[in-house]
């Protein structure tokens, strides 16, 4: 049985060129990007296919060779892969559930702070040369987030990181999750 691994769109994973794929064994073939036709050609005889945000439809999966046993999505989301079609073909799909948890949570908090401070409106004023918002009286409203209530849907890795940062900002937390815990530590579970 082939142990070959094919990374079909490494460019999506290595956008900052920090990864050194050259240290991988000869059993791992790495391609910067692949069209669907190239992908099918390149994975012939492969056991594992590694992708990053590449659409893998039922139609594309129907062309996969029988040697493929595993598709690895090199990120958290795997909605780009037709899971039912993969299952029918006997291909396991896995992802990296804790990948960039902090970055995603920080982006959520950044958006909250952006809206609370009407940052986009203020930037727009500055771009036009309007500095009236920075005089004695603010022309654009600003809302403090401390004491405000944040609703979080899902208390997985990302949700819990959002909660941690929001609590540090003094926010009250309501959480809806499939696996609620007892209220406490500044968190109230709701349904």
Residue ranges and their predicted role:
Residues 23, 138-191:
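Rossmann-like dinucleotide/phosphate-binding beta-alpha-beta segment
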Residues 22, 62-67:
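Short, conserved loop/helix-junction motifs that constitute active-site signature segments
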Residues 2, 68, 146-149:
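Phosphate-coordination loops involved in phosphoryl transfer and adenosine-cofactor binding
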Residues 97-149, 175:
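Phosphate-binding beta-alpha-beta segment of Rossmann-like dinucleotide-binding domains, i.e.
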């Amino acid at each position: 049985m082939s142990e070959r691994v094919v990374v079909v769109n490494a460019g999506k994973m290595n956008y900052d060129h920090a990864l050194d794929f050259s240290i991988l064994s000869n059993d791992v073939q790495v391609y910067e990007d692949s069209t669907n036709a190239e992908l099918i050609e390149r994975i012939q005889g492969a056991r594992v296919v590694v992708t990053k945000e590449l659409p893998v439809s039922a139609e594309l999966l129907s062309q996969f060779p029988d040697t493929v046993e595993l598709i690895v999505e090199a990120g958290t989301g795997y909605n780009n892969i037709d899971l039912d079609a993969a299952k029918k073909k006997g291909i396991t799909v896995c992802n990296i559930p804790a990948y960039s948890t902090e970055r995603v949570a920080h982006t959520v908090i950044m958006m909250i702070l952006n809206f609370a401070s009407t940052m986009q409106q203020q930037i727009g004023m500055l771009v036009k040369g309007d500095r009236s918002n920075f005089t004695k009286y603010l022309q654009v409203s600003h809302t403090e987030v401390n004491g405000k209530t944040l609703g979080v849907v899902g208390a997985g890795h990302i949700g819990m990181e959002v909660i941690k940062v929001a609590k540090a900002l003094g926010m009250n937390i309501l959480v809806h999750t499939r696996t609620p815990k007892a209220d406490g530590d500044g968190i109230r579970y709701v349904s």
